[in-house]
Amino acid sequence: MNKLNVWSVVKDGAKVGGANYWSVFCTVILYFLTVWIPYLNVGTTIAIQQLSVELAKGNRIKPTYIFAAKYRRRMGEFLVLEGIMLIAMIVGFFFGVIPMFVLSMAWGLASMLFVDKGLNALEALRESNNLTYGNKWRIFWAGMIVGLAICLLAGIAAGVCAALEYKVLGLVVEYILIFLLVPFAYGINAIIYRSLVLERETSEVE
């Protein structure tokens, strides 16, 4: 079982996000510009799950890949997967919130495994749970560090604007900064996927 190192995940994730910044950023922008289009939006939502996988494999990202017809073929199965996760999260919330967070980390790889490995909904959830076993809190802290860093930078920018009595501008700047830093979040996911899935497969072959 691979054990994640929180600081290595953050550091390497930032490198991956930075090295692929514009391709990831353009992909995310393209996704949000077209997410309102019925039917197509399901395919692009499935495709966007592949983004961190491609980064983990070191592949070059072409933003228009999200429109490939192959992603729409498994629309029904994907909706089943997302539906199961959503219902379980809601139930977890009513059991004291903490189960919801545990499930979100345990199943964090499910959508990527669904797209990359062609697993069905239950297989993806089971495999994700197995792969993240013993690493859930490491994943949590890696995400927390990145999230806090992004919010801190955005908050400072918004605070400066507010101090200059440009409160509306401050909010706009805050959201823009958060959006601009999204590629680094994808980089973090890529390192987690690479460490827990791809490197594990390589070690098993050897």
Residue ranges and their predicted role:
Residues 2-33, 64-91, 103-156, 190, ...:
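Interfacial aromatic "cap" segments that immediately flank transmembrane helices
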Residues 31-61, 86-126, 165-201:
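Selective recognition of hydrophobic, aromatic-rich stretches within alpha-helical transmembrane segments
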